[in-house]
């Protein structure tokens, strides 16, 4: 947002989009509620949806598609008192131990991943000493035990010897547990005349964001180029063909990804 403002964009914060209308080449309208409660309707040739999983544009269009071949869910919560992954409590004092060898950087300051049959777990250190701990699992391979999301998360964490050790004296932050029953989704279209969806608003694969951010970046750059071409006067029929090709190829890319 800072970069956008430096490039001449007018940034409203806080603000909330309360309605919008897509009218193709005739233009689009977006109604925004500002911090003081006033509502302003602006018109634009292009609307870019970057609302994350809220996916305002796609939900209004009805273009969201589930990924039936990748039935994953996730639970996550912040913990206090997680052990130091490089500390003696976990690593021990024997430098010949396979878990201690060849460790150059501090694992405590990095995102660490632990895997098991049908699932993977993340440990992400946060400011203030808390650690985000999350679970992603494939419902075809694993059904975590428990009645509540926290109980299900705890059952898997307790079943993994290393995460069980890491959380021996840790406590979850009360009221912080979150659950998503269906993680991945795609859109039937990512761009068309006058609108596009980017980032998680354009689809979501997995919380493993290392490849996920690559996919987002590819999509943003390609759609930016198409918007610039359209604004520079490229023929509508030519752009329509380009949009169709992009939608088909990007969906194939995400499916393969």
Tell where the protein language model's regions lie, with residue ranges.
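FAD/FMN-dependent oxidoreductases across multiple families
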Residues: 111, 117-121, 125-129, 141-257
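Predominantly flavin-linked oxidoreductase catalytic cores and closely associated redox partners
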Residues: 3-165, 220
């Amino acid at each position: 947002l800072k970069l956008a403002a430096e490039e001449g964009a007018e940034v409203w914060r806080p603000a909330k989009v309360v309605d919008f209308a897509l009218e193709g080449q005739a233009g689009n309208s977006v109604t925004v509620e500002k911090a003081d409660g006033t509502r302003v309707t602006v018109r634009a040739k292009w609307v870019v949806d970057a609302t994350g999983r809220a996916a305002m544009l796609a939900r209004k269009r009805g273009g969201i598609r589930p990924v039936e071949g990748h039935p994953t869910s996730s639970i996550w919560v912040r913990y206090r008192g997680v052990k130091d992954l490089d500390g003696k409590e976990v690593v021990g004092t024997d430098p010949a131990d396979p878990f201690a060898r060849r460790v150059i950087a501090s694992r405590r300051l990095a995102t660490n991943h632990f895997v098991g049959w049908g699932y993977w777990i993340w440990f992400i250190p946060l400011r203030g000493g808390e650690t985000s701990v999350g679970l992603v699992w494939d419902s075809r391979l694993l059904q975590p035990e428990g009645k509540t999301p926290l109980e299900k998360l705890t059952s898997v964490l307790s079943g993994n010897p290393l995460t069980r050790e890491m959380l021996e004296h840790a406590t979850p932050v009360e009221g912080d547990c979150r659950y998503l029953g269906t993680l991945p989704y795609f859109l039937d279209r990512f761009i068309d005349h006058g609108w596009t969806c980017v980032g998680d608003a354009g689809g979501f694969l997995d919380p493993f964001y290392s490849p996920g951010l690559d996919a987002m970046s590819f999509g943003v750059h390609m759609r930016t180029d198409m918007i610039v071409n359209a604004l520079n006067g490229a023929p509508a029929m030519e752009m329509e063909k380009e949009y169709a090709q992009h939608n088909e190829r990007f969906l194939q890319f995400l499916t393969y990804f």
